[in-house]
């Protein structure tokens, strides 16, 4: 399928996707019932969409195009109520978190969807292993060239986005010692990590043509980069965050990305170069492994900075943009999170350290999601 022309969007409009866990009490393992839930709610959703993701234990909640985080929060809140009621009617529960702490990938059923079945044929067991749960945020752009500039600008802050959303310390019944283990699942995919370097939309079109020669890439949706342009929506999509445990934190993360995008495209503070990515994977790893306690390294100077310090600096820089787009509440909440040192990955570990089981942890996550 050829790459579509870049659809012009209103700059800084917002779309958010949350991949949720469908679990089966009292054992709280992943259920294989997302299709049943989707059928139950499809005529009750008035804004946004509830749909499949890769496997039957995943349920995606997606907003419509929103002007700001308040509109997005309203849509999510309405969807949440409908989904929670449908889940209760079918003796299921819903929760966030980037990974389920003890599910076995071998049990996961790939959705009966042509695209997902084709992906299963291409990637085999890797697709079942990709039963992990992330938050994706789309930001509208006026042109393809703006999208490429924004993509490179946001890529500088991938460690910050990962660290602030880290919520996947447990996997396959084990403490991984990572704050966010979810991104590691995609390391075997040939398109893992950052998009190959291009400097404008014309070069991106050439890149996509080259990738399509592999026969594994039929559309932009087949590319799993950390951040990717979405020409059919006219957006840049940030894909590195774990699904948070609460709806409010998910909205705050979206506000952070929207405000950062506004700052980048209005101030144009960087002249992007290919060398910007020289230490990208090392800095990304620091965020995944240590969260906000990680350290990032400047590829030009070699200076090393604590992620906590650099995140506070970012929040300060984008505060005026956040005010202009109605996202100040998100930036203030994230600032409090960084200063307090609290994060969802550590809260999970604290629960287990206090004697809680992994089954009890999932139950707690369901209570948190339903109570937010």
From Swiss-Prot:
Pfam families: GCS2 (PF04107). The keyword Transcription does not apply. It comes from the Bacteria. Keywords: ATP-binding, Ligase, Nucleotide-binding. GO terms for molecular function: ATP binding; glutamate-cysteine ligase activity. It catalyses: L-cysteine + L-glutamate + ATP = gamma-L-glutamyl-L-cysteine + ADP + phosphate + H(+). GO terms for biological process: modified amino acid biosynthetic process. InterPro entries: GCL_type2/YbdK_subfam, GCS2, Gln_synth/guanido_kin_cat_dom, YbdK. Its EC number is 6.3.2.2. Belongs to the glutamate--cysteine ligase type 2 family. YbdK subfamily. ATP-dependent carboxylate-amine ligase which exhibits weak glutamate--cysteine ligase activity. Homodimer. This is Putative glutamate--cysteine ligase 2.
